[in-house]
Structure formats: C-alpha cells, structure tokens
Amino acid sequence: FFLADEQMLEILSQSKEPRAVQPHLGKCFEGLNTIKFEKDLKITQMISPEGERVDLTTPIDPESGPNKGNVEKWLLELEGLQWVSVRRQVELALQDYPKQKRIDWCIKWPAQAILAVSQIFWTQKTEEAIDAGGHQGLDKYVLDLNQGLTDIVMLVRGQLSKLQRKTLSALVVMDIHSRDTNVTMVTGLIEKCSDFQWQSQMRYYWGPAWKDGQAVKKGEGTVVARIVNARCLYGYEYLGNSMRLVVTPLTDRCYRTMISAIDLLYGGAPEGPAGTGKTETVKDLSKAISIQCVVFNCSDQLDYKAMAKFFKGLAGCGSWCCFDEFNRISVEVLSVVAQQ
C-alpha cells in the first residue's frame, strides 16, 4: 500500500532472485537499509542505513518450502522476525544492565535497545527515589544522573566509531531530558509517585502484555509506555540508529495529548507555524514507542481513492501516518475521508 505500482512490479517480477528486493527494503521497513544474505541465501542480519547490524533470532530461508519464489511470503516472515529480534535484544540488554558499568554496557547493544532500557531503569530508579524520600530522595538521584551524564560525555570525546558516537549522542539527549525532568520535580517539591508532576511524564516499564501485541504473547514481559492515564505497548519496529529530538516542555505537552488521544482511539492534529517541528515531533513520538510512522505529503490533487488505499495500508500493518499539509486536501475529498 505504501509502494508505487512500478516498485511492486519490480519486486514481484524478480521473485526468483531474493537479493533483488534490497533496493526496496527502505520503503517497506523504516529502519532497514539492507539485509545480510549468506552464501546459501539465508537471511541472518538486518542492517540499518547507519550500518548497525542486528541478528535475526532465526535465519530466514527464501529458497525453501512455501517461500521459494514467493517474495511476499518471506517478506512477511522478515516483518515478524524483525519484531521478535528487536524484542529479544531489548530483553537481553535489560538483563545485562545491572551486571556491568553503564559506559561499557551502552556501546555493546543496538541503539534502540540502549534507549528503551535506559528509560526503563530511569523510571524505576526515579520511583524508588521518590518513595524513599520524596523530593529529597530525588535530589540525591539527580547527583547520580549528573555523574552518569559526565561519564557518557567523556566517552563521546574518546575514540569511538561513527556508529557508537551516534548512539551515545541520542543517549545524551535522552539523559539530559531525564535529568531536567527530575530537577523540575525536585523544585516542585514532589512527595509521592501519584503526583501529577511525575504521572504526566513518559514512563517506561517492563511488565506483562495485557493484550496480544506485536512479537509478544499474552502475559509475556514487554515494554509498556505510560503517560497520565494512557498506556501503550512498545511496537518493536526496527528503527536503526536514528537521532532523537531535544525535548522541550511543549514537546512533552504534545506527547501527553497525542498518547492520550491514541489510547482513546482518536487521532491528533498538531497546529502551528511552518517549520516549528510538528511533523518531527510526531515522528519522534513514534520512535519513542517504536512504531512505524509513514509521512505523506497531501496536495489538492489527491482523490478519495488514493486516501482509501492509504488507510487500508495503515489498518493492515498497524503503523501511524502523518498527513503533512492536510489543509490542502479539497473539501469534497475530506468529506469522504471522514466517512472512511
């Protein structure tokens, strides 16, 4: 649904040559640039545009059984294994975190696992600090956060690969926001975890899934994001090693509104002057909960059939869509879109 007809034809017409799919992977999966084929054509790794490699939990054989000559079947298998593999990396990184120094841990795992697990432990330690001594307990934890930030900054200044530097840059952005959030709560004299100052923040927990989620069986451990009364399952879409937005109070407010809307099965429409980061904020929120976000530029030439095709794709794969310049769509098409 998100590929042009020419691209679909090219993929399907070369079904006997699995490697011919490589140029189109970026359109199907946001964080994938290529996949690694072994000599026997088995697929063993996902490779991001930045060059990060993540092992698949089990190899995919496009040349065996029902997969042979059916590119659509092994691509579906790749989609499912992508979720399972990312979840496995997050789970292993979570178990490994308490066993070694953070500066050693954060250059060992894929960027996505590092950011998710760091946020889980920040949530856990912040709640422990508040329970232990309210704003005074939290003030002590802020000192630990500052020390952790200093260690990461020293690491960034050292000898690192381009990939590791990018991962740590994203981690520093997240850590600074976590530290600033805690400083604000100390200033606000927070006393318990149920205070709105803490409940209004994006919090990450590792807990049982309350419904069948992607790559998660009911009751298994998974990452759950919470903000105020809303909660959503982490999507495990592989996003590669991408940079994250610097979070401001307005970004936080937008996150609260959007997640609450999605929890109530609504959509959201950020509004404001051009170039202020509306689209990027929505994209960054999708990265925060690891869900694919497709950006679609609207125009007055768009008809209801094209929109219907897009909605089918969104419903089929569970991804988000950001309709840029939505106001350009003609009223006649908008009325049909509202019905759809």
Predicted feature residues:
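Amphipathic alpha-helical packing elements
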Residues: 1-32
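Extended, charged/polar low-complexity intrinsically disordered regions
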Residues: 22-249
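Conserved RecA-like P-loop NTPase ATPase core
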Residues: 258, 279, 307, 311, ...
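Pre-Walker A (Motif I) flank of P-loop NTPase domains
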Residues: 254, 264-268, 317-319
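N-terminal pre-P-loop "Q-motif" helix
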Residues: 246-258
